[in-house]
From Swiss-Prot:
Gene that specifies this protein: lgt
Protein name: Phosphatidylglycerol--prolipoprotein diacylglyceryl transferase
Keywords: Cell membrane, Membrane, Transferase, Transmembrane, Transmembrane helix
Highest classification ranks of the organism: Bacteria, Bacillati, Bacillota, Bacilli, Bacillales
Annotated GO MF terms: phosphatidylglycerol-prolipoprotein diacylglyceryl transferase activity
Organism, as annotated: Bacillus mycoides (strain KBAB4)
Cysteines paired by S-S bonds: none
Length: 270
């Protein structure tokens, strides 16, 4: 196949005069809206008015984006210290999920305290929504042709029985790459199904959220090992270090909260 003969998708969804609207932002926004819809439905079933989650999203999403960008810039400071004007440019990506998660959790804790609500109850309800947003959001990386893995052959990708539009989009600068965005997206969608099923098990309050953290972190650890654009700290892949830490801390929290009697309430209790 001749170089440049592979049809690819445009990163720009629509052009509004001089302003391009990128698929990356459209896809992220879609993930947020679908996650909000899922959370408000479950929240109302458990006695929390939908406006609570709408208010939370309006506050948490901008803060999560800010933290996600800050996290990314910190670990890529060698580049951004020389190109400070690019720090606020997120049209081409550059949002780190772990940073966004830190921002969202801090916001959720403060929001719950101010509203007199249980953070763990809000977190449990939001867990499937967050993972759904992450599953959808990875397709923004797909459109940007980022967050991919090592070089592979077209035959390898065809052997995965992927549709042509995915295979073609993985053709970057004359080389085909592992669609790691897809692996993580599928893992996250499977996690959403698991979390929705676990709602019926009526776990102790907070443990659905910890299950989300563990599930996502396990998948991210293995997918990260395939990526070529990992944020690094010396020889370590930051996302893998964070994933291990999150799994360990989540398990410790589950055990300690049970032993201290802080997890007596169940998911379905008001």
């Amino acid at each position: 196949m001749l170089l440049g003969s592979v049809p690819q998708l445009d990163r720009i969804a629509v052009q509004l005069g001089p302003f391009p609207v990128y698929w990356y932002g459209v896809i992220i926004g879609t993930g947020v809206l679908l996650g909000l819809w899922l959370a408000t439905r479950e929240g109302e079933r458990l006695g929390i008015h939908k406006d609570t989650f709408i208010d939370l999203v309006l506050i948490a999403v901008p803060i999560a984006i800010l933290f996600a960008r800050m996290y990314y810039v910190i670990f890529e400071w060698e580049y951004y210290s020389q190109n400070p004007s690019q720090i606020i440019n997120i049209r081409q990506g550059g949002l780190a999920i772990h940073g966004g998660l830190i921002g969202a959790v801090i916001t959720g804790i403060l929001f719950a305290k101010r509203r007199g609500l249980s953070f763990w109850k809000l977190a449990d309800i939001a867990a499937p929504s967050i993972l759904l947003g992450q599953a959808i959001g990875r397709w923004g990386n797909f459109m940007n042709q980022e967050a991919h893995g090592d070089e592979v052959t077209r035959q390898f990708l065809e052997g995965l029985h992927l549709p042509d539009f995915i295979i073609n989009q993985m053709y970057i600068d004359g080389v085909y790459y592992h669609p790691t965005f897809l692996y993580e997206s599928l893992w996250n969608f499977a996690g959403v199904i698991l979390l929705l099923a676990l709602r019926k098990v009526n776990l102790r309050r907070g443990e659905l959220f910890f299950t989300y953290l563990i599930w996502y972190s396990v998948g991210r650890f293995f997918v990260e090992g395939l990526r070529t654009d990992s944020l690094m700290l010396g020889p370590l892949r930051i996302a893998q270090v964070m994933s291990i830490g999150i799994v360990v801390i989540s398990i410790i929290f589950i055990i300690v909260r049970r032993k201290m009697g802080q997890a007596d309430k169940r998911y379905l209790e008001n």
